[in-house]
Amino acid sequence: MGTANLHDSTNKPLYGERIIEESNIICFENPNKKRIYEISIELPEFTCKCPFSGYPDFAKLNIYYQPNMKVYELKSLKLYINKFRDLKISHEEVVNRIMDDLLKAAVPHWIHLNADFNPRGNVSMKLDIYSGQKRN
């Protein structure tokens, strides 16, 4: 078994970085298409960078959705979300991009994406985006 060389100064991506970079949202078939049900997913460690200062922004993302034909696979979703860690992007743009990718991957009946950004400089921000018609 090999050991990590902590003094390796090459710019070669580490295995975790490669996996994150190559990741996409994967879905699997909804196991019960006849039933209307709601799934909630919490991603409490979302990060991206402020496009103006370069400082990190931290948020908790909550996804609530009613699946149609497909359901999100959680590990792929986690890896996909990690892609934004070093990206300089506004709160509004990143949340809309995530919503677009969620809609493209699974086409749920209804989805709500909530982003609760941590306060920075005495200012906090919450974003909510909805798509589709919630069913009862």
From Swiss-Prot:
Keyword Nucleotidyltransferase set for record: no
Annotated GO MF terms: preQ1 synthase activity
Classification via Gene3D superfamilies: 3.30.1130.10
NCBIfam families given in the database record: QueF-II
Family: Belongs to the GTP cyclohydrolase I family. QueF type 1 subfamily.
Function as written in the Swiss-Prot or TrEMBL entry: Catalyzes the NADPH-dependent reduction of 7-cyano-7-deazaguanine (preQ0) to 7-aminomethyl-7-deazaguanine (preQ1).
Protein name: NADPH-dependent 7-cyano-7-deazaguanine reductase
GO CC, any one term: cytoplasm
Taxonomy of the source species: Bacteria, Bacillati, Cyanobacteriota, Cyanophyceae, Synechococcales
PANTHER family according to UniProt: NADPH-DEPENDENT 7-CYANO-7-DEAZAGUANINE REDUCTASE
Enzyme kind, highest EC tier: oxidoreductase
Keyword Cytoplasm part of the UniProt annotation: yes
Residues annotated for substrate binding in this entry: Y72, E73, L74, H91, E92
GO biological process: queuosine biosynthetic process; tRNA modification
This enzyme's EC code(s): 1.7.1.13
Keywords: Cytoplasm, NADP, Oxidoreductase, Queuosine biosynthesis
Catalytic residues (positions): C50, D57
Places the protein is found: Cytoplasm
Pathway in which the depicted protein is active: tRNA modification; tRNA-queuosine biosynthesis
